[in-house]
């Protein structure tokens, strides 16, 4: 993994790394098992363009997840810190859609999608 870091986002802990390739569920659980600290998930950040990154988020059991709001915040901070985007205002692409984020020093603000209240989507 490239640029691997441990990040904490308001109660959730992650290993974040630059995206290199798709990994299997077994490979993800191996990363979790090898972690020296307990983690909630693994996030791979893929550069899309100078203002957009894609978040590949996996729970600690290796299953993919559509969204983790704290994971989005860590993704945005990682992207800025590793110069994957040109400035501190960016788009984080997640399976649920694009999420706007602004990184200001150690604070990350996001526009989270509204919760789904329909039983069809549950």
Label every PLM stretch briefly:
Residues 113-116:
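Ligand-binding beta-strand-loop-alpha-helix segment within the catalytic cores
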Residues 120-122:
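Conserved small/polar residues in nucleotide/adenosyl-binding loops
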Residues 1-105:
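A glycine-rich beta-to-alpha transition motif near the start of alpha/beta enzyme domains, typified by
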